[in-house]
C-alpha cells in the first residue's frame, strides 16, 4: 500500500483505511473510515495531506459526511487533523478521552510538547486547528458510541499516553489499537516498539496489550499501520519486546553513564525499516530511546 491509497479492511464490510503519507513514508500512518448509519473517522493523521484525506472519506462514504471523529489519543499523529475535520464537516462531533479534550480545544501545549519530542520531524507537521469546545465531548472507560448499526466500546489504555483509548467495534469485532499494541509493519509482519516521551509507561503498556488479548477480536486495526488478523502470539511477542527494549536501554545507561550517548548508540544501530526509509527509522529510534529513558527516570531501578 502506498501513501494516498484507500482500501477496504479485508474481511469486513463498510470499513476502510487510508495511508496518510505521514512523514513522507508509506505504510506508517492510518486513518480508518467506518461506513455506518452514523459514519465515523477513527484517528485523523497530523493534518498534512488533509485534502487527500477528505477525498478518501468522501469516497468511502459515497459523499456522506461523518457523524463522529474519534482520535484514539491526543498525540498529533493521531489527533492533528481533528480540528480540520471539524471544520470540513460542521455536523460532526469529536469524541476523545476526557484528558485529551483540553489539548484538542487549545493545542498550544500539545504543539510545544510535540516539537520537543519529535525534533527535526516537526517539518512534516502543520499547526493543528483547534476543535471548538461545543463540538467535542470527553470519553471515559466503559463508554459506548452508538453508530446506529454498530456499537463501539471505549477502553482506557494509558500506557502509551494517559489520554489514550482503544475502540472495540463489537459488530465487526475489530479493535482499533491506537498505539497500545505497538507499530505494526505489514511488510515484515512484525510489531515494533513505540515508547515516546514523556508519559510512556512500560508496565502499563503490557497491561494494555493484555486488555486487547482479553477482548480476543477478529481483527486489529493499528494506528501504525493497517489491519491484521488478531494473533495472541504476536501480542505476546510484543509484550516481550517491550520488556527487552526497556532492559536494553537500562543496561546501556549503566554502561555509558550518559543519556545522550545512549540515545546516539541506539540511533547509530537502528534497524532500518525499508518502507519508512533511513531518516524515519532513525528518528523513531531516537524518540523511543528518549521515552524509555524518561520511564526509567520515573520508576528508577525497579523497571
Where are each of the predicted segments found?
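Residue-level marker for buried hydrophobic side chains located in beta-strands
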Residues: 40, 70, 94, 174-176, ...
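Metallo-beta-lactamase
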Residues: 47-48, 102-158, 162-232
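Histidine/acidic-residue-rich catalytic or RNA/ligand-binding cores of hydrolases
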Residues: 231-240
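C-terminal regulatory/interaction regions
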Residues: 252-303
